[in-house]
Curated annotation (Swiss-Prot):
Coiled coil: none annotated. This is DNA polymerase delta subunit 3. It comes from Gallus gallus. Accessory component of both the DNA polymerase delta complex and the DNA polymerase zeta complex. As a component of the trimeric and tetrameric DNA polymerase delta complexes (Pol-delta3 and Pol-delta4, respectively), plays a role in high fidelity genome replication, including in lagging strand synthesis, and repair. Required for optimal Pol-delta activity. Stabilizes the Pol-delta complex and plays a major role in Pol-delta stimulation by PCNA. Pol-delta3 and Pol-delta4 are characterized by the absence or the presence of POLD4. They exhibit differences in catalytic activity. The keyword Glycosyltransferase does not apply. Component of both the DNA polymerase delta and DNA polymerase zeta complexes. The tetrameric DNA polymerase delta complex (Pol-delta4), which consists of POLD1/p125, POLD2/p50, POLD3/p66/p68 and POLD4/p12, with POLD1 bearing DNA polymerase and 3' to 5' proofreading exonuclease activities. A motif (PIP-box) lies at residues 451-458. Residues 155-172 have a biased composition (Polar residues). Residues 148-229, 249-380, 399-461 are annotated as: Disordered. Its main location: cytoplasm. Residues 215-228 have a biased composition (Low complexity). Keywords: Cytoplasm, DNA damage, DNA excision, DNA repair, DNA replication, Nucleus. The gene is POLD3. Residues 205-214, 279-304, 427-436 have a biased composition (Basic and acidic residues).
């Protein structure tokens, strides 16, 4: 009677509930031994197939046996479907056991559903997972409640003993235990304080360096507009040039002082307690740098004085040049009493005002990689161009700026003064009025000849 009830239960699980019934799941559900559950599944399959040969039942089998691989014998346990059972048996050298593992209506593609079924039922009976197992161990005897309590007390005592030994190993000093703890805690704070101080000093140095870089850039930016503004005032006399140079020269020592200040703190964080002996040698380096800066300042002051002496002469020459141009234009107006259309269309000579402005700009100095400074000098050069309408060559003297180094300038100073040209001698000795009269006469003669030839050509036509 009991066997029939069990078979009815299995039929209900498989057909009605459409479950996957494994021997483990059936053992825990019905509370029977695993071997009995396997026998029940086998009987259900045989009985069902005898009653109805067309019944849709898919069975999986648990096969175990010895397998020979590469000359070595191994024991293999596999879960296979019914259609692959004979193939698996043929692979095994000896078959030790064949059991029904599960019964289900659907055809399984893999072993995932079988694993999930067994996992869920074992999780539900985790404390009695080996209750219906066929594997037994004689030494695996459950403990009595007294033995369990005794084991817990031993575990507690073993956990307290390390704390007691640590307390005994730290005796009080002069009857005051807490002071020892405070003293032990102080050194880490000191070490952390040292690291914090180093980090703070590095952060301050990092902040100082950008400020030092910004300061020279701001001063340079402020000096450029002032220089541009003062260039236009150079036409009104020597006083404006002197003010510009006085403003530009003191600005340089400030920048150099800031550079020295930034270089000294940059070297300080690199020094460590292990390199205390090297500090005196490092202190002498800023002193040497200051001496070099002083020497460079003196050289700059001397050069600025020499430039001040040269520039008044250049200004006089410039003013003379402007006056000469004005006088030439007035002579042309006197000679040309009846201008023609062709003469009105003739292009005027290129203006010299931009060239004069370029001449009045202060000589810019650039420091090269080798330490030499480059200057820009003004040189008087003659330029020739062809006047297309008049068909003649015209020469003009224009000041051009050339770059040279300090060494080239010093070499030029040491050379003996070149012999001045013959036309330059009467310029210095003769008074200004005689020079003007001579130039006016020469200009009028040349212009008159040109105009007469052009007028004669027009009259012939």
């Amino acid at each position: 009677m009991e066997d029939e009830l069990y078979l009815e239960n299995i039929d209900e699980f498989v057909t009605d509930q459409n479950r996957i019934v494994t021997y483990k799941w059936l053992s825990y559900t019905l509370g029977v031994h695993v071997n009995q559950a396997k026998q029940m599944l086998y009987d259900y399959v045989e009985r069902k197939r005898k009653e109805n040969s067309g019944a849709q039942l898919h069975v999986t089998y648990l096969v175990a046996g010895n397998l020979i691989q590469n000359g070595h014998t191994c024991h293999k346990v596999a879960v296979v479907r019914e259609d692959k059972l004979e193939a698996m048996k043929s692979k095994l050298a000896t078959v030790t056991s064949v059991h029904v593992y599960s019964i289900q209506k659907a055809l399984l593609k893999d072993s995932g559903p079988l694993y999930n079924t067994d996992y869920d039922i074992i999780k539900a009976n985790l404390h009695n997972c080996s209750k219906f197992s066929a594997i037994r161990c004689a030494d695996a005897v459950p403990r009595t409640p007294a033995e369990v309590a005794q084991a817990r007390t031993l575990a507690r005592s073993s956990s307290q003993t390390p704390s007691d030994t640590s307390a005994v190993s730290t005796p009080p000093l002069n009857g005051h235990g807490p002071t020892a703890a405070k003293q032990s805690s102080q050194p880490p704070k000191g070490i952390m304080g040292m690291f914090a101080a180093k980090a703070a000093s590095k952060a301050q140095d990092a902040n100082k360096e950008p400020k030092a870089k910004e300061a020279p850039s701001v001063s340079a930016a402020s000096s450029k507009p002032s220089a541009k503004g003062n260039i236009m005032n150079n036409f009104f006399g020597k006083a404006a040039m002197n003010k510009l140079k006085v403003n530009s020269v003191p600005g340089q020592p400030k920048e150099e002082k800031e550079a020295v200040k930034t270089s000294v703190p940059a070297t300080e964080p690199e020094s460590s307690p292990n390199t205390i002996v090297e500090k005196p040698g490092r202190k002498t380096e800023p002193a040497k740098i200051q001496q070099k800066d002083k020497k460079s300042k003196m050289k700059r002051m001397d050069k600025s004085d020499n430039e001040e002496e040269r520039e008044p002469e250049n200004q006089k020459k410039k003013r003379k040049r402007i006056k000469q141009l004005e006088s030439d234009s007035s002579d042309e107006e006197d000679v040309l009493a009846s201008p023609t259309l062709e003469e009105e269309k003739a292009p005027s000579p290129p203006p010299l005002v931009p060239a004069l402005k370029a001449e009045l700009e202060p000589a810019s100095t650039e420091a090269s990689a080798g330490g030499k400074k480059r200057k820009r000098k003004r040189v008087l050069k003659s330029k020739m161009f062809v006047d297309e309408e008049e068909g003649c060559m015209v020469t003009e003297k224009v000041y051009e700026s050339e770059s040279c180094t300090d060494s080239e300038d010093d070499f030029a100073k040491t050379k003996p003064p070149a012999v001045p040209k013959q036309p330059a001698l009467p310029v210095k000795k003769e008074p200004k009025e005689e020079r003007k009269n001579q130039k006016k006469g020469a200009a009028t003669a040349s212009r008159a000849n040109k105009q007469i030839s052009i007028m004669g050509f027009c009259q012939k036509k």
